A protein has these predicted regions:
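Catalytic pocket-lining loop regions of alpha/beta-barrel enzymes
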Residues: 1-107
């Protein structure tokens, strides 16, 4: 199953008062955050425990943000004693894929 950078809705994402060019640049950059939300919800929902052979891919959202997100998930898992069968990094390794897009630093 895949999710794209446009998943998650667009309402209230950019500040008002911007001209169209600034708004499009801002929105196009922020859209990556929607995939972050999807991954966090996927990891903490318990869905990956219930369906251990179902795979997911984050499409056209790059990969540079993934290490930070997984580190934050690991931290919150420990802070909140979330009852998961695996660690967030283990779920990612087992069931989640991501695609490069425009970044070069992570290649």
């Amino acid at each position: 199953m895949n999710f794209h950078i446009g998943s998650g809705g667009l309402g209230g994402i950019v500040w008002g008062g911007m001209d169209l060019t600034r708004m499009l640049a801002s929105l196009s950059t922020i859209l990556f955050m929607n995939n972050m939300r999807c991954l966090v919800n996927l990891i903490f929902s318990g869905l990956l425990d219930r369906f251990p052979t179902l795979n997911f891919v984050s499409v056209e959202s790059g990969i540079g943000w993934i290490p930070f997100l997984l580190e934050a998930c690991e931290y919150q898992l420990d802070e909140n004693a979330v009852p998961l069968e695996l660690r967030p990094r283990e779920y990612f390794a087992r069931q989640i894929y991501a695609s490069f897009w425009l970044e070069r630093a992570d290649v």
